[in-house]
């Protein structure tokens, strides 16, 4: 009986160690609002907000599509960047038309380009429409 009691004292620590990774994963899966995205540069997050405008530069190298979140360019809170020339096969719709003025959540790595927060989007699976 004494051996069991001695082993039981380690049970809370063991539970904590086993469940901590689950807790950390759950935290990283918690959506954040687009206005907070700049705080998470260098991390992979789910970011939610309204795409207020889009721009497709068809003739530019890589065919970039810019999704401006929160506010119009050049004051956007975050830019979603789709290199449509490389990743068009991963979309069943035209992102620059379909996503304009939509409220969405996007999952990806948050980076910064020329002082602006951005996220590269490679597939429509990263994008979920929000009610």
PLM feature spans:
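OB-fold and OB-like single-stranded nucleic-acid-recognition modules
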Residues: 24-131
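Bacterial N-terminal signal peptides
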Residues: 12-21
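Bacterial N-terminal signal peptides that target proteins for export
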Residues: 2-12
